[in-house]
Amino acid sequence: YINYKNMSHQHTLMLFNLLPVGSNISTWWNFGSMLLSCSMIQIMTGFFLAIHYTANINLAFSSIIHISRDVPYGWIMQNTHAIGASLFFICIYIHIARGLYYGSYLNKEVWLSGTTLLIILMATAFFGYVLPWGQMSFWAATVITNLLTAIPYLGTTLTTWLWGGFAINDPTLTRFFALHFILPFAIISMSSIHILLLHNEGSSNPLGTNSDID
């Protein structure tokens, strides 16, 4: 039995140089494209949430309630954005685990661009976690940003600068919202570089053979 449909599909991809990988890859190689889908969902839902969100310590939580209750389909946007973030991390950890297991780290440029992406993603998620300004948001902002004080000489100055004062307050929330809004564009840029480098070098496969073997 020969799957001609699958063969023609692969041939089309190879014709346009869109498949820098052997045909022996497994399901574990799906998570890269799934991460791109997650990015698109997060950016679209995030944009609609940002329209109705208010970056003020007295109004932030109320604006979240307003999105859930009053904005048409706001509850879908909010839940999709929150659950989508968890899905994003599930996909990225599986993506990294596959890379570790099959030795993708040998492709240094792709691996380092991916590491940079993970750091930016974790920072973006942290800033987003703070935005509802609930009890846990306040606690997270205090604890995580306080880690900066461990840096010798510069720590206290850096923390004060990040907070916008001597304690977490309105300026902190405003800049966290600005960072949460701008960092996804850095993620898009780094993702483009990540994919460009991957297509330049070629992906790994379960056997560790050359990407152009077939």
From Swiss-Prot:
Family annotation (Gene3D superfamilies): Cytochrome Bc1 Complex, Chain C (1.20.810.10)
Task: Return the protein name.
Answer: Cytochrome b
- Residues bound to heme b b566: H95, H194
One GO cellular component, as annotated? mitochondrial inner membrane
Question: Record's InterPro entries?
Answer: Cyt_b/b6_N (IPR005797), Cytb/b6-like_sf (IPR027387), Cytochrome_b_N_euk/bac (IPR048259), Di-haem_cyt_TM (IPR016174)
Q: Does the keyword Transmembrane helix apply?
A: yes
Q: Which PANTHER family match?
A: CYTOCHROME B (PTHR19271:SF16)
Q: How does it sit in the membrane?
A: Multi-pass membrane protein
What's a GO biological-process term for it? mitochondrial electron transport, ubiquinol to cytochrome c
Q: Which organism is it from?
A: Trimeresurus stejnegeri (Chinese green tree viper)
User: According to the entry, what is the taxonomic lineage of the organism?
Assistant: Eukaryota, Metazoa, Chordata, Craniata, Vertebrata
